[in-house]
Amino acid sequence: MLTFFFLWISTLLLSSFIVYLLYRRRSAQCPPLPPGPNGWPILGNLPQLGAKPHQTLDALSKQYGPLFRLRLGSVNVVVASSSAVAAQFLRTHDVNFSNRPPNSGAEHVAYNYQDLVFAPYGPRWRMLRKLCSVHLFSLKALDDLRPVRQGEVACLVRNLRRHADTGVLVNLGKALNVCATNALARAMLGRRVFADEDAQLAEADEFKEMVVELMRLAGVFNVGDFVPGLGWLDLQGVVGKMKRLHRRYDAFLDRVIEENQANAKSGDLLSVLIRLKEADAEGEIKLNNTDIKALLLNLFTAGTDTSSSTVEWVLAELIRHPDILQKTQHELDSVIGRDRLVAESDLPNLPYLQAVVKETFRLHPSTPLSLPRMASEECIVNGYKIPKHATLLVNVWSIGRDAAVWNDPLEFRPSRFLPGGEREHVDVKGNDFEVIPFGAGRRICAGLSLGLRMVQFMTATIVHAYDWSLPKGQECQKLDMEEAYGLTLQRAVPLMVQPIPRLSHKAY
């Protein structure tokens, strides 16, 4: 009996030892999770993100490397902070990261994931993207709508001229937002949404405020998204604000659709969407009113504020660097002269202007943190295990300031993108990951081509048509460049400037 007992104990110990060896061997073969900071109980690293998460994450990348991990509540989050790591996620593993994680903004503002930006990757998403690509963003559509953009930019010039004549400072961001919104609205709806009359200035201000509020709320790391058990408490008040903002947008979009149906023009995007809603083609994915409003919401917000805020940053940098402003204006005068305004067809002949825009995208990307993506399956990136359902954030802001890639990364230096410069061949269209303001991969911004044209065109026009001065007492070199974090990168202090005409009278 005693012999049997010792035999049993020996077998148990031997089995345990074998299991331990197998576990050690498997652990040695299994890649580790990315490194990262310790977090708080329950909340994880959420309290550490601060008011400007893109800057916090940039600082953490200096400590933990270009790929690190956070625990936000119960959610694994991996952060890519270099162009090389971003390329592995968005090129090598693009399919695996083509979905979005659950998000309160998508639920409460974007019609419960019915929009293009947050829709699950699949047939419906492809259909929505195709609709936008064919009717708004294809080369043919862009060329057909060129007169629309030129007309709206000409309206912007006239608006600025009124400020110049009266000596009244202009809030440049708002003026640019009206221009971008009307240009997009004429393509989407066949008409403008804001007129030049003073009666509609308040409406334009309200719309700009709604867009900024949406982008701010969309950039908040809502505790309820990461600790579902606390969601009902709405500790930050974010969900309540989202629901109120949604009601305002919904009323605005209802009015837009009703007015379009009363004055329908067959060529605009909304008319096409309404026809698809009424169609009964077998096998086609049909649209309902909610689908249409969700898509319009995407286009009106992402397609307007990103462009206008970028141009605002461009002009702020040029005001701070008079020598670069002078070079830009010299190129514009050489190509266009001073007797007419810039035409969109002039843009390919303005390499220095294009470099100025690229440099602004590098330092002030319109979306500092990429929209989150989610791992559909476990994978290996940069030697680390990325768990299934982990959320991916690409720190676009950090990539543009990476000292391992850029010489003097905090300096505004457009020449780095010119022939002989350190990154002369880098583009911003998702092919080169050093500058990715529009994202990359399958879920790259659908409006990339239009957005790039509008930013270049508005920048070229206002820099060519006007000199710029700051309010009395402000020095160019001391211009406030503080950021206000949100889904888009706003200026903390709006750029208030005085335009000074520099072209011949007949050009205006």
From Swiss-Prot:
Give the signal sequence positions.
none
Membrane protein topology class = Single-pass membrane protein
Q: Which domain of life is it from?
A: Eukaryota
GO process terms (BP): flavonoid biosynthetic process
Entries under InterPro entries matching the protein: Cyt_P450, Cyt_P450_CS, Cyt_P450_E_grp-I, Cyt_P450_sf
Which pathway, metabolic or otherwise, does it act in?
Flavonoid metabolism
Which tissue types show expression of this protein? Expressed in young cromes.
Q: Name one GO molecular function term.
A: heme binding
One CC-aspect GO term: membrane
Annotated catalysed reactions = a 3'-unsubstituted flavone + reduced [NADPH--hemoprotein reductase] + O2 = a 3'-hydroxyflavone + oxidized [NADPH--hemoprotein reductase] + H2O + H(+); (2S)-naringenin + reduced [NADPH--hemoprotein reductase] + O2 = (S)-eriodictyol + oxidized [NADPH--hemoprotein reductase] + H2O + H(+); (2R,3R)-dihydrokaempferol + reduced [NADPH--hemoprotein reductase] + O2 = (2R,3R)-dihydroquercetin + oxidized [NADPH--hemoprotein reductase] + H2O + H(+); kaempferol + reduced [NADPH--hemoprotein reductase] + O2 = quercetin + oxidized [NADPH--hemoprotein reductase] + H2O + H(+)
Keywords for the protein's UniProt record, in alphabetical order: Flavonoid biosynthesis, Heme, Iron, Membrane, Metal-binding, Monooxygenase, NADP, Oxidoreductase, Transmembrane, Transmembrane helix
Query: Tell me, what does this protein do in biology?
Result: Flavonoid 3'-hydroxylase that catalyzes the 3'-hydroxylation of flavanones, dihydroflavonols and flavonols. Converts narigenin to eriodictyol, dihydrokaempferol to dihydroquercetin and kaempferol to quercetin.
Recorded protein name is Flavonoid 3'-monooxygenase CYP75B137
**Organism annotation:** Crocosmia x crocosmiiflora
